[in-house]
Design a protein with these regions (language model features):
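AAA+ P-loop NTPase catalytic core and its hallmark functional loops
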Residues: 1-185, 189, 252
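Alpha-helical lid/collar subdomain of P-loop NTPases
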Residues: 1-3, 10, 165-166, 170-171, ...
Length: 254
C-alpha cells in the first residue's frame, strides 16, 4: 500500500512495535490513519486484523462466543482473540464509538501481562510475542459520553495525525488520484479554504480522502467543477449557505 510519511511516524511506530507498545492514532477523518496501519503491517510483514468499532459492539464481538451448530455448541474466537493467538496487529478503528465497558476487555492485553482472559470458556490466552494492538479515533468530535477512560488512554503510546502540508498533500492526491500535479494543487487549495471554516459552520474541513475521490473523478474524464461538487461539496454539508461558500471556493480555482 502507498503511504507518504509526513514526519517521523514510521520510525516511531517501528520503535513502538519493537517494544510491543500499544499505539493510539489520533487525527481527523480521512487523514491517513488506517492507511498508515495497513502500510506498517505490510512493512513489518505482519498480519492485520481490523475491527470497525460501533456502539452495538459487545465484549463478545471482540473476544468470542459459543455458537450452536449440529453437534451442539462450539467456541468461536473473536477478532481480538485470533490476533492474540496468531501474533497479528489488531487495529480497532474509531475506538471511541465502542461502549466503555467493551473497551475494558483490551486492558489485560495492553500492559505488562499481555493476556486475554476468556471468562466464558475459562481460558487465559497468552498473547503471541508478535501481537500488538493499535487503536484510532478522531479527537475532534468526542463528547463527554464518547471519550476513552484515562485507564485506557494511559496504556498506549500516541501518534498525532493531521492533514499533511500542502506540497505533501498535493503529491499524495496526484499519486492516489492519478492526475497531474496542477489539478491536485488546486484541489488542495480548495481544501485548505474549507479547513479554515472548521468551527464556523463546518464540523470538519475536506479530508485528504475526499480530495483523492475528486481527483479520481477528474482522472475518469469528469469535468473538474462537477467532480468537486460531487466529491467535495455535497458530502460535507447540508447547509445551503455553506454549500454556496464552498462552491465559490471551487469556482475560484476551476
Amino acid at each position: 500500500p502507498y503511504y507518504r510519511a509526513v514526519s517521523d511516524e514510521v520510525e516511531m511506530y517501528e520503535a513502538a512495535y519493537e517494544a510491543r507498545m500499544p499505539v493510539m492514532l489520533k487525527g481527523p477523518t480521512g487523514c491517513g490513519k488506517s492507511r498508515f496501519v495497513e502500510y506498517m503491517a505490510w512493512k513489518l510483514q505482519k498480519p492485520l486484523i481490523t475491527v470497525a468499532c460501533n456502539e452495538d459492539m459487545t465484549a463478545s464481538d471482540l473476544v468470542g462466543r459459543y455458537l450452536l451448530d449440529i453437534n451442539g455448541t462450539r467456541w468461536q474466537d473473536g477478532p481480538l482473540t485470533v490476533a492474540a493467538r496468531i501474533g497479528a496487529i489488531c487495529y480497532l478503528d474509531e475506538v471511541v464509538e465502542a461502549r466503555q465497558d467493551t473497551t475494558v476487555v483490551i486492558h489485560p492485553l495492553t500492559d505488562h501481562r499481555r493476556v486475554l482472559p476468556l471468562e466464558k470458556k475459562g481460558e487465559l490466552v497468552q498473547a503471541h510475542p508478535d501481537f500488538q494492538i493499535v487503536i484510532s479515533y478522531n479527537p475532534g468530535y468526542q463528547s463527554l459520553m464518547k471519550d476513552l477512560k484515562q485507564s485506557t488512554k494511559q496504556r498506549f503510546g500516541g501518534l498525532d495525525f493531521s492533514y499533511p502540508e500542502s506540497d505533501v498533500e498535493t503529491e499524495i492526491v496526484a499519486h492516489e488520484g492519478d492526475v497531474e500535479t496542477e489539478i491536485a494543487d488546486k484541489l488542495v487549495r480548495i481544501a485548505e479554504r474549507s479547513r479554515n471554516l472548521k468551527g464556523h459552520g463546518l464540523d470538519e474541513g475536506m479530508s485528504t480522502r475526499l480530495l483523492v475521490y475528486a481527483a479520481q473523478l477528474v482522472g475518469k474524464g469528469v469535468d473538474p467543477m462537477a467532480a468537486c461538487q460531487m466529491a467535495l461539496v455535497t458530502p460535507l454539508t447540508d447547509d445551503p449557505d455553506m454549500r454556496d461558500t464552498l462552491s465559490a471556493a471551487v469556482n475560484t480555482y476551476f
